């Protein structure tokens, strides 16, 4: 039985996210799969990561990239078999790597056995597994909309009822008020723990306690009661790493999710920092330049509020976000420098860092010539909507280049060979044409690559407890070009200093710290003086205090 979150293994762990469809194909069908992941475990071991967060591989009609699950206890055939999954657990374990499953507990697919039963009659034992309201066709129970657009209610004529769906019409919401539903989900989680799962990422977990009659979707009144029961019945029975996805979380709410007593989760994914380059009140496609002062204040707030009262997850990339080197860095002349600078800024903070596949290579956004080359449903819908509203095609494509989820979903770039070494067949989605320059084979042959810089950062975190325990203090809060902070524990004081621009910047802090030991720097030569070169990053430490 787990007793709280103090000194847990995951506090100095680094997690690597895999989007299986785009990682490595093993059988030439153009789709990444589980045997492909197994074949790349040695690469991940070399990087130094401790856990893999695996995007969903359960059986699914793939209406929403596998987040619409039709069987929690089976594997989607395009990814492999249950035997493959068991082999992945075993091979990862041999290398000291845990597998975090991606769990959706808010809804299932409408093709799940429970829902097929639930639709048969109001008396069916599975009917109350979902959220139903009586009504008349065309007169919705209320005016709530789904996240993906359109009403959140779907009429089922044979029952004379509507079911509630916060997401796609093919993703009916589960009824967490029903103890039988909760028990089924807990038993399923325990089954995966028995199989070898080392942790879970919980998709849209802040929406399970919805109360549609009151139009409450996230952070419903019973949310934390449900989460404590979930944790008690499942995660606390093993040494799990757990992270809840909560778009609307504030630091105060995150304290509950990641309470050091271990009653809910290890940590939470919050997205406040990721929204800072989006026009307020507009859509994600409406971008504005990143204001560094705002980014610093936002991250400092999370660092300071959760210090000793919760735990942060540190990330800039995932399967839904554009590539960070293109977003906040410079993916041309200073690609290596800005990729490593951003990594330094993030990994120096308190929390568990997440690396998204290809981030460790400095993979960039993609710019396909025509909308026909894109796959992501959100992107295709936006293109159509904005054309109808009178936007120019070039203007829309510019937004897609900056923001499309497809930027994260182009296949992993393993080598300069055809299709980047991802597949011997026809890839499900085109590889970014820059794979001939940016790929893992090149990176592994260049000791100054982004890959080896990430490897060094990960090693530093493992060797120096100040990364885990040190108190955070933001320096130069109003500086629009430099992001600098210290971390301090009883033995070490560490300075993280980064230049967010493509120009040289003088930084007087470097004079004050010149007697310290340089732990890592993203330029090959050490240089005296207080000038930071374009996108330069350095960590300096005084130890023995």
Annotate each language-model stretch with its function:
Residues 2-545:
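Active-site and adjacent substrate-binding regions of carbohydrate-active enzymes
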């Amino acid at each position: 039985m787990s007793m709280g979150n103090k000194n847990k293994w995951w506090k100095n762990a680094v997690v690597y996210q895999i989007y299986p469809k785009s990682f490595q194909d093993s059988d030439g069908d153009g789709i990444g799969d589980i045997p492909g992941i197994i074949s790349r475990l040695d690469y991940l071991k070399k990087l130094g990561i401790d856990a893999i967060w695996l995007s969903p591989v359960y059986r699914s009609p793939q209406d929403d990239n596998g987040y619409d699950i039709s069987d929690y206890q089976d594997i989607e055939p395009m990814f492999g078999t249950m035997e493959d999954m068991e082999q992945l657990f075993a091979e990862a374990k041999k290398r000291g790597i845990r597998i975090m499953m991606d769990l959706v507990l808010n809804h299932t697919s409408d093709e799940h056995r429970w829902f097929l039963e639930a639709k048969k009659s109001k008396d069916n034992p599975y009917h109350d597994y979902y959220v139903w309201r009586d009504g008349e066709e065309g007169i919705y129970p209320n005016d709530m909309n789904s996240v993906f657009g359109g009403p959140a209610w779907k009429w089922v004529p044979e029952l004379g009822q509507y079911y509630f769906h916060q997401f796609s019409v093919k993703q009916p919401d589960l009824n967490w008020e029903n103890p039988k539903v909760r028990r089924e989900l807990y038993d399923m989680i325990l089954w995966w723990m028995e199989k070898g799962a080392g942790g879970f990422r919980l998709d849209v977990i802040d929406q399970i306690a919805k109360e549609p009659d009151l139009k409450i979707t996230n952070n419903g009144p019973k949310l934390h009661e449900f989460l404590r029961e979930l944790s008690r019945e499942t995660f606390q029975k093993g040494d799990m790493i757990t992270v809840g996805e909560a778009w609307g979380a504030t630091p105060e709410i995150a304290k509950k999710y990641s309470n050091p007593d271990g009653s809910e989760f290890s940590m939470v994914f919050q997205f406040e920092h990721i929204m800072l380059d989006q026009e307020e009140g507009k859509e994600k496609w409406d971008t504005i330049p990143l204001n560094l002062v705002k980014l610093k204040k936002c991250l400092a707030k999370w660092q300071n509020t959760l210090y000793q009262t919760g735990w942060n997850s540190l990330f800039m990339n995932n399967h839904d976000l554009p590539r960070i080197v293109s977003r906040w860095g410079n993916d041309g002349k200073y690609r290596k420098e800005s990729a490593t600078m951003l990594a330094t800024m993030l990994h120096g903070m308190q929390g568990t860092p997440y690396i998204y596949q290809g981030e460790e290579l400095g993979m960039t956004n993609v710019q396909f010539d025509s909308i026909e080359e894109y796959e992501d449903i959100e992107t295709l819908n936006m293109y159509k909507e904005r054309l109808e509203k009178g936007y120019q095609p070039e203007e829309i494509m510019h937004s897609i280049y900056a923001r499309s989820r497809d930027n994260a979903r182009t296949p992993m770039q393993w080598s300069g060979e055809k299709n980047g070494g991802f597949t011997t067949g026809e890839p499900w989605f085109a590889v970014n044409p820059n794979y001939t320059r940016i790929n893992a084979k090149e990176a592994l042959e260049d000791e100054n690559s982004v890959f080896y810089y990430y490897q060094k950062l990960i090693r530093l975190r493992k060797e120096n407890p100040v990364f885990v325990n040190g108190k955070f203090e933001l320096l130069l809060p109003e500086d629009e070009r430099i992001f600098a902070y210290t971390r301090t524990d009883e033995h070490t004081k560490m300075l993280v200093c980064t230049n967010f621009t493509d120009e040289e910047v003088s930084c007087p802090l470097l004079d004050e710290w010149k007697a310290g030991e340089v732990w890592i720097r993203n330029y090959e030569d050490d240089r005296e003086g207080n000038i930071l070169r374009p996108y330069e990053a350095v960590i300096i430490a005084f130890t023995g205090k």
